[in-house]
């Protein structure tokens, strides 16, 4: 993919919809001097990534879709830098500007250096689901209202950060998308008890998870449910890893390997599920 708007060392792309079909690849061109590529989806549909998503160069790739992101069983990543996927509605920058997916008519970005964080302030954040093999050379970050990964997450030389957060949260980042900390609302922010994950996967027939008659997501064969604010992880390989759930953190037949720190954080329960 070519084009976009260059501002300093950043390249900005906007899409009405963004999907990668099974067996196909979508690669962002990486002009000289570009260190980070920021892409936002301004339409009303989730992104379905069923093929390979990558960068033709060393730039970090950020994908923002407030409607949800689904990585299918054949999905893979091919960036030489870091990857961040989020259902936040906006990226925040050091000069006070935002790259918003829900308010794309804001004044154009002029001079932007590095992102400071992602912001969730448009109701219950949508879900991210991964059933594929997501691997990066540097950092791999998935940030949503619910994050369920029954596939592979791999960043042997970097950080893997997976976080499920409530509306009103701001997540602070490094210049490469590494999660630094989470500023969650202390109180007063209503939560939607419906399942954004169910909406994302209900017609997909994907392994490990199913949507029951009450439109809630369950682990196949267990009866345990996944609600908004949960994180589900199966295979994680990284230098360091931080898995943060607003509600429950569930490790499904998990194989988690790190050479450095491993942080498992849950507002409610950490569950280990085997079949």
Predicted regions and their residues:
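Extracellular and secretory-pathway beta-repeat/beta-biased strand scaffolds
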Residues: 1-275
């Amino acid at each position: 993919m070519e084009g976009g708007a260059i501002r300093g060392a950043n390249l900005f792309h906007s899409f009405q919809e963004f999907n990668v079909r099974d067996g196909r690849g979508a690669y962002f061109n990486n002009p000289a001097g570009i260190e980070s590529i920021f892409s936002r989806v301004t339409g009303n549909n989730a992104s379905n990534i069923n093929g390979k998503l990558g960068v033709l160069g060393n730039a970090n790739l950020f994908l923002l879709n407030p409607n949800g992101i689904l990585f299918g069983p054949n999905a893979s990543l091919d960036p030489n830098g870091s990857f961040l996927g989020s259902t936040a509605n906006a990226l925040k920058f050091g000069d006070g500007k935002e790259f918003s997916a829900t308010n794309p008519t804001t004044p154009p970005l002029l001079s932007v250096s590095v992102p400071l964080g992602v912001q969730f302030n448009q109701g219950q954040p949508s879900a991210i689901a991964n059933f594929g093999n997501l691997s990066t050379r540097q950092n791999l970050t998935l940030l949503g209202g619910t994050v369920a990964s029954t596939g592979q997450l791999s960043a042997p030389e970097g950080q893997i950060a997976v976080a499920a957060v409530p509306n009103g949260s701001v997540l602070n980042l490094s210049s490469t998308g590494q999660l630094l900390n989470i500023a969650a609302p202390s109180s007063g922010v209503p939560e939607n008890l419906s399942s954004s994950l169910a909406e994302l996967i209900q017609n997909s027939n994907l392994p490990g998870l199913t949507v029951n008659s009450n439109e809630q997501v369950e682990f196949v064969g267990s009866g345990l449910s996944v609600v908004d604010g949960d994180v589900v992880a199966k295979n994680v390989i990284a230098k360091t890893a931080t898995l943060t759930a607003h509600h429950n953190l569930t490790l499904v037949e998990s194989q988690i390997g790190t050479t450095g720190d491993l942080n498992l954080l849950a507002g409610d329960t950490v569950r280990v599920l085997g079949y």
